[in-house]
């Protein structure tokens, strides 16, 4: 009850402060969003908090990856285990408790794990037209996993010509950065005719080893550098040297390319057809935090890398606005995706290199319909089908003898199915009051075959599991006058267990191994939120949202047994057996607040603060801080914008997480955190000062420069396995036509 009272107190205090302000000004809160209902809607009719990042905002900041793009909002905390990482954390939830949607297609797969993921970096920030984040459960519209929030990415779409003359357009960008020696090149070009158009986009990025700052905890300095060294037919003699460059974080560099191709055909104004092809691939890249693990005073691993992360999507989309008795608008979306990832590890001075490779083939089909029954009443309904085919292989290679062997795969061979139907109603009973309610039924099925896993299991090798889930939401949005917006919403979300939950074998931390559990059931989240927004003329906007989420039947890691034993030999070490189980409840409450101001004609200020308090139940009944509830964090910016010039000073910050407030699971990861006087892991507070400038040299040509972390702070955001860049100068030039 303590954290509920804290959240209520903060919300009431901020509410009172806003109420005391003058509300005689007139405003118009008419931003268009699609995240809440899967259809374009005015944000003033939605009962949930939605944040939008448009193309212009993203383009002016030039983020390196889509993960960095999300952090621009100041409302999403991004965790990185390595430089090639990016794991969004929203309202105390992350990974497979968040939903990723790309052009209306579900990106989450059956192997999205509870540990940190980096699938979002497969998206190209240069090719994203807009990003919307729906905070809180969005299960009615999006199904399983949408517990903490939904990230809706809309990529660039081919434009059509409004005249008989073809329209040709495009953009090209070159960018470099000093902290990692980055080079990025991007180009997209499109042509539009009266009824059809196409768009081609390509981006290539090369990042070197990342350099951290010089002022901060010495615990973040890399002690040793390992150079793998072996001769086929002879021996292994890996070279370990003392790191003499305190800024260097190696190995951490990687490169990546993205391709997008779209075709569009619109025979008339009421019918639109699109085909899209996306492909993304990284190079092999090191998991930096694992390279910091020590054993007997030396690095444990000579190699610990992720293999190339690949993502491909073929998508066809049909949109129709030919009104009839069933619908006024219709969208049909079909997609086929392929995901490939792998993990490659070899211990120091050992000859066995283990590779676990995964491939997921994901088929999906969505149909969404909208019917405006009355001017004040709209009905949205639809259905979804998803199928994931999972293939997992474990292979060992002796680097001396070149002999191969079978090692444990990460997952069994499996298939995961999800089928859902939903309906939502939006009603405006009186002017300035909108009420929304929705209901969804979802059914999932998992079929697993452990005979290919490379180890024996204490249950039948062929397993099947299925269950149904009901989710719902009801909320209202009230605008008592043109300057006010108030939201109240209740939503229930769910997460069906996937192949990663039920079938994974992996080491979660030093001395622990997680084993399969095919008997898991869905977990459920109940969320209530209250949001208030007030706009004073054209110069000031204040937005405050308080929320509380209760997670029941939570899937958590607990000590267990495997084949009757509490320990299991894994990678040459006797490890304590753990298993994911429906064994806990978790609670998260928090406040998100924002302020946007314009003054003195050309100046602006904006700020975002986020406070969350999470607790989850341990196996002994005690409470621990929630792992994905980040410490207090936010962003502030003061800028000047006039005609061709924009100059902005901005600050990013995070509060401390003291040792006694660290989640139990994080306390074991001493290799990635600073250590206090007692040798306990903690996450220090930090703040950075940054400066950026944009200058439109002439029509179509823009120069962007940024000086990040001016004080050269050595800092590491909470739960990250690698430090953020030290002082970093970036420069980019963009030409658009």
Predicted segments — roles?
Residues 8, 252-254, 264-266, 307, ...:
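Conserved C-terminal beta-signal and adjacent last beta-strands/turns
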Residues 107-137:
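Short acidic/polar hinge/loop motifs at secondary-structure boundaries
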Residues 180-207, 216-284, 310-312, 373, ...:
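Transmembrane beta-barrel wall of Gram-negative outer-membrane proteins
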Residues 250-256, 266-327, 338-360, 408:
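Flexible loop and strand-edge segments within Gram-negative outer membrane beta-barrel domains
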Residues 283, 294, 338-342, 396-400, ...:
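Surface-exposed extracellular loop regions of Gram-negative outer-membrane beta-barrel proteins
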Residues 301-323, 410-416, 461-479, 483-485, ...:
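Outer-membrane beta-barrel signature, preferentially recognizing the C-terminal barrel domain
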Residues 379-484, 506-507, 620-621:
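Signature of Gram-negative outer-membrane beta-barrel scaffolds
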Residues 430-431, 435, 443-444, 547-550, ...:
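Gram-negative outer-membrane beta-barrel transporters
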């Amino acid at each position: 009850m303590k954290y509920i009272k804290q959240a209520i107190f903060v919300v009431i205090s901020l509410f009172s402060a806003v109420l005391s302000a003058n509300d005689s000004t007139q405003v118009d809160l008419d931003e268009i969003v699609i995240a809440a209902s899967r259809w374009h809607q005015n944000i003033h009719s939605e009962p949930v908090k939605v944040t939008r990042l448009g193309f212009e905002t993203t383009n002016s900041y030039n983020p390196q990856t889509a993960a960095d793009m999300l952090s621009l909002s100041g409302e999403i905390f991004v965790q990185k285990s390595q430089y090639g990482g990016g794991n969004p954390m929203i309202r105390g939830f992350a990974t497979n408790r968040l939903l990723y949607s790309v052009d209306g297609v579900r990106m989450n797969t059956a192997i999205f794990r509870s540990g940190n993921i980096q699938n979002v970096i497969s998206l190209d920030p240069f090719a994203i037209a807009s990003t919307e984040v729906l905070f809180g459960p969005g299960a009615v519209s999006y199904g399983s996993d949408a517990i903490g929030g939904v990230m809706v990415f809309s990529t660039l779409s081919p434009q059509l010509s409004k005249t008989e003359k073809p329209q040709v357009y495009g953009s090209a960008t070159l960018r470099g950065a000093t902290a990692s020696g980055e080079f990025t090149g991007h180009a997209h070009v499109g042509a539009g005719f009266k009824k059809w158009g196409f768009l081609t986009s390509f981006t290539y990025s090369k990042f070197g080893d990342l350099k951290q700052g010089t002022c901060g905890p010495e615990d973040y300095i890399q002690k040793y550098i390992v150079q793998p060294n072996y001769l086929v037919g002879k021996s292994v003699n890996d070279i370990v040297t003392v790191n003499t460059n305190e800024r260097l974080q190696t190995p951490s560099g990687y490169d990546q390319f993205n391709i997008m191709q779209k075709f569009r055909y619109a025979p008339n104004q009421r019918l639109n057809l699109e085909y899209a092809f996306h492909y993304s691939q990284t190079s092999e890249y090191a998991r930096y935090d694992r390279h910091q693990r020590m054993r007997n005073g030396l690095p444990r691993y000579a190699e610990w890398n992720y293999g190339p992360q690949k993502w491909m999507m073929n998508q066809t989309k049909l949109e129709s606005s030919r009104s009839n008795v069933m619908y006024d608008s219709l969208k049909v979306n079909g997609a086929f995706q392929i995901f490939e990832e792998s993990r490659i590890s070899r211990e120091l001075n050992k000859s066995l290199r283990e590779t676990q490779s995964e491939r997921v083939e994901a088929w999906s089909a969505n149909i969404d319909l909208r019917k405006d029954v009355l001017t004040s009443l709209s009905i949205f309904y639809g259905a979804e089908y998803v199928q994931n085919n999972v293939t997992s292989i474990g292979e060992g290679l002796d680097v001396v003898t070149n002999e191969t062997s079978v090692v444990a795969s990460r997952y069994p061979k499996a298939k995961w199915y999800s089928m859902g139907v939903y309906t939502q109603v939006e009603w405006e009973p009186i002017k300035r009051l909108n009420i929304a309610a929705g209901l969804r039924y979802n059914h999932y099925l998992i079929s697993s075959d452990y005979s290919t896993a490379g180890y024996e299991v204490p249950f039948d090798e062929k397993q099947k599991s299925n269950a149904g889930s009901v989710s719902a939401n009801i909320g209202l949005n009230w605008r008592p006058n043109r300057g006010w917006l108030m939201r109240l919403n209740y939503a229930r979300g769910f997460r069906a267990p996937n192949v990663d939950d039920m079938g994974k074998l992996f080491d979660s931390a030093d001395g622990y191994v997680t084993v399969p559990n095919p008997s898991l059931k869905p977990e459920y989240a109940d969320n209530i939120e209250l949001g208030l927004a007030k706009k004073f003329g054209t110069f000031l906007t204040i937005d405050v949202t308080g929320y509380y989420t209760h997670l029941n039947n939570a899937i958590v890691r607990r000590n267990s047994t495997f084949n009757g034993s509490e320990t299991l030999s894994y990678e040459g070490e006797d490890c304590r057996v753990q298993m994911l189980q429906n064994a806990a409840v978790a609670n998260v409450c928090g406040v998100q607040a924002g302020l946007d101001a314009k003054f003195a004609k050309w100046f602006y200020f904006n700020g975002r603060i986020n406070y969350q308090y999470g607790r989850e139940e341990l196996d002994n009944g005690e409470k621990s801080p929630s792992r994905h509830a980040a410490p207090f964090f936010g962003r502030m910016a003061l800028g000047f914008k006039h005609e061709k010039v924009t100059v902005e000073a901005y600050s990013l910050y995070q509060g401390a997480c003291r040792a006694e407030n660290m989640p139990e699971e994080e306390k074991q990861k001493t290799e990635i955190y600073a250590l206090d006087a007692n040798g306990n892991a903690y996450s220090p507070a930090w703040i950075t000062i940054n400066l950026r400038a944009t200058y439109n040299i002439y029509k179509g040509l823009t120069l962007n420069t940024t000086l990040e972390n001016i004080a050269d702070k050595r800092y590491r955001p909470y739960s990250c396995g690698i430090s953020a860049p030290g002082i970093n100068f970036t420069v980019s030039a963009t030409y658009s036509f």
